[in-house]
Structures are given as C-alpha cells and as structure tokens.
C-alpha cells in the first residue's frame, strides 16, 4: 500500500512539475538567455523554496494563507511586484545578460539562487497547493501528529528532488539552445526582451490570479 501510494505520488508530482508554470518557465528563460550555471542556480533556489513551503505546511503555518484572504493577497501582490521588478530589470539592464560561454562569478550565481528562492516563497499558490496536494498521499489514521508531519516533510522532499531533476534537465537543454542563439547579437537582444516580457507577464498573471 505504501509503495503504491509513493508511486502514485511520484507520477502525480511529475505531471504537476512538467505542466507549464512560473518556475519551469523562469528556468527555461534563464537557461536560454544566460546559460547553464545561472539556470541551475535559479533552479536550486526554487527547490529550496519548495522545502521551506513544505516545512511551513507541516507545522501548519501555510494554513493561514489558505484561510486568510488578506495574508494570501499580501504575499501574492508582493510576489507579483517582485516578478515585475525582475522583468523590468531584465529589459533595462544589458549587464544582466552575459554570453553562456562566459563563466558567471560565484556572487552572480548566489544572486540568482536567491532570486529563485524569493520568487518561489512569494508565490502563495505554492503554499496552498502543498496543503491541498500532499495530504492526498498521506497514510490514513497516522499514529501521531509528529509522524504525520514527518511524512508530510518526506513527501515534500520527494517533490523538491523531482522538481530539481526536471528543472536541471530544462536548464541544460535551454542553455544549449541559448548558446547557439546568443552567437547572433540580434538573437541575444531578443532573448533579453523575451525574458523581461515573460517575467512581467508572470507577475501580471500572479497579481490577477485567485487562490485556485
């Protein structure tokens, strides 16, 4: 029963992760525009955010977002503003984009890690999703609250690891495409505009979205 439950969870998780959304689209655009290292750093940041969301859900804090329209809206609009800021910054700053052949400095990679982390944490729909999704695969009549929380964390860890694997594959594939396109200056400039517009669009989409 447990093995079947985990198998179903993995299958359902992969279906969710592969579905187009802000996280995988962000990794895709970073990989195309700025190369493998930047995209991977962004992916690690986002998956770290998933672990934090799991922890918050396990201790019950995410339930506040599910119940409070005010708390949900505050975080949602903060996330939308942050995405909009990243998009405008990409559109205005040519320094944001370097050739994928150049190795980004470590400080730059840390910056993109924290951008990915912040972007994920400021999306309240992730927290609400975890509250709705993970309990479906919990063991009924768990012996203790502590055991239930540990299982919640284990499922969240599996989801984060699956996300990291998928996002890493997207980052590597996108960086190969970006490396070829960036050799043409016109394509490189188009990639900058594409990334900026995608981020602004994701911000607008988040701002206009509901809880579902």
Say what each PLM segment does.
Residues 122-127:
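Selected transmembrane alpha-helices and immediately adjacent juxtamembrane segments
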Residues 7, 11, 106-118, 150-157, ...:
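Alpha-helical membrane-protein architecture signal
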Residues 37-112, 173, 204:
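Membrane helix-loop-helix hairpins that form the core translocation module of multi-pass transporters
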Residues 2-73, 132-160, 178:
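Juxtamembrane transmembrane-helix termini in multi-pass membrane transport proteins
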Residues 67-96, 160-170, 178-212:
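Selective transmembrane alpha-helices of multi-pass membrane proteins
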Residues 14-17, 120-121, 160-168:
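Residue-level hotspots within the lipid-embedded alpha helices of multi-pass solute transporters
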Residues 22-25, 84, 128-131, 164, ...:
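Residues that mark transmembrane-helix kinks and helix-interface sites
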